[in-house]
Structure formats: C-alpha cells, structure tokens
C-alpha cells in the first residue's frame, strides 16, 4: 500500500492490515489476547530477542494489534512509524528521554502538569525555567 496515495478515510480502515487476517479472513483487526508467542527452536528465540529476526516476542513489547494501531496512527499523521504506550505519563517520559540529555535545561510554561514537572526536576534532575510570557528577550 505504500506505493499509492490513499485517502485519509482509506488509511483509517486499511493501513497496518493490508490483507485480511490469515487465520480467520476477517477484515477487521483481531484483538489477540496473549502475552506470549511460540518459537520454533532456541535459535529462533535467540534471533527474535537479539532483534535479528522481526516478530513478536512478548506481549508487553509488541503484538499484532498494537502494530496495526501504530501503523495507522503514523499513516494518519504522515509519519514513518509510531509508538503506542499505555499512558500519558509513559508518552511524556519517552518523549523527554529522547530529546533531553545530562545537564540540559528545559523551558516550559509555569502551569506545566505536576507529574511532568516532577519528572523533569526530580527524576531527571534537569534545570527548569518558567519565563514570563511578557519576557520576549529570554
């Protein structure tokens, strides 16, 4: 599906599951209620956990339903890939861990959510500044 431009409505329905479910021929994305997956042998497991072979290894890390969701959100937002997390706090943590480093200084609004403020100042131990909106020189 990546070769042709699809309309927004089509992306909502089809991206991430271009073919019907092979086990059931269902058009809708199945919700797999599992946490574990079968490996053909120990080498297969080693390759999966070593990230040499793409595929599911444990339900909290990856699963088919989540993969379709991530692909659809990425397509709808015009992105390359997506990452789904279980909460807003997890999303904030992932975002900050990927853009901030040791000794960085963050500038944010003074009404920043308390959980985010504590994550930045206490967990990450970063400097935090909340300038006045009137102070355009800062």
Predicted regions: what they are:
Residues 2-31:
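Short conserved active-site loop signatures built around small residues
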Residues 123-127:
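Short helix-loop-beta junction
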Residues 41-90, 115-122:
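Conserved N-terminal alpha-helix of the aminotransferase class I/II PLP-enzyme fold
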Residues 33-38, 42:
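Positively charged, low-complexity intrinsically disordered leader regions
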Residues 75-76, 94-102:
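Alpha-helix C-terminal capping segments
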Residues 128-138:
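Single conserved hydrophobic/aromatic residue that forms the stacking wall/gate
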Residues 98-116:
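Conserved PLP-anchoring active-site segment centered on the Schiff-base-forming lysine
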């Amino acid at each position: 599906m990546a070769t042709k431009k699809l309309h927004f409505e089509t992306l909502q329905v089809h991206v991430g599951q271009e073919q019907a479910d092979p086990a059931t021929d269902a058009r809708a994305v199945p919700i797999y209620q599992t946490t574990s997956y079968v490996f053909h042998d120990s080498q297969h497991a080693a390759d999966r956990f070593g990230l040499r072979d793409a595929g599911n290894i444990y339900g909290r890390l990856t699963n088919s339903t989540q993969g379709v969701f991530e692909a659809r959100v990425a397509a709808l937002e015009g992105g390359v890939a997506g990452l789904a997390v279980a909460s807003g706090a997890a999303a904030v943590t992932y975002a900050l861990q990927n853009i901030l480093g040791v000794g960085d200084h963050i500038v944010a609004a003074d009404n920043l959510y308390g959980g985010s403020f504590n994550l930045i100042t206490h967990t990450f131990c970063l400097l935090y500044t909340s300038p006045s909106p009137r102070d355009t020189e800062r």
